[in-house]
């Protein structure tokens, strides 16, 4: 079934690891289910901001042409390892119906974002 993914966000960690656990056979469209990244890192202060302020910060960042989005396609039994402060989102999901075909993603965050002086 077709569903929207997790909207644009950044993780409050140093390194994020996403494990995609659902087999490829469940994915009805190889163009869906992956992650889009922007080459922009949120500032450390971002994590203490209100939800409205976070939205404004992220929108301004992804509107910048230098943000240059790129997609990492979904793959069952695949790992995506990235700097947590990079803006990213889950792309639209189009997987087969049924519990056993749900897109399962396990995310582990390591460390805290480093503060630069």
Q: What positions do the PLM features span?
A:
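Catalytic core of non-heme Fe(II) oxygenases with the double-stranded beta-helix
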Residues: 1-117
């Amino acid at each position: 079934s077709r569903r929207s993914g997790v909207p644009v966000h950044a993780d409050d960690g140093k390194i994020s690891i996403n494990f995609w656990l659902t087999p490829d056979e469940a994915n009805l469209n190889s163009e869906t289910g992956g992650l889009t990244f922007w080459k922009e890192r949120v500032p450390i202060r971002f994590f203490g901001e209100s939800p409205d302020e976070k939205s404004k910060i992220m929108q301004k960042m992804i509107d910048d042409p230098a943000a240059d989005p790129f997609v990492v396609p979904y793959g069952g039994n695949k790992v995506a390892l990235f700097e947590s402060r990079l803006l990213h989102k889950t792309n639209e999901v189009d997987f087969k119906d049924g519990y056993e075909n749900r897109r399962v993603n396990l995310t582990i965050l390591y460390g805290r974002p480093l503060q630069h002086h």
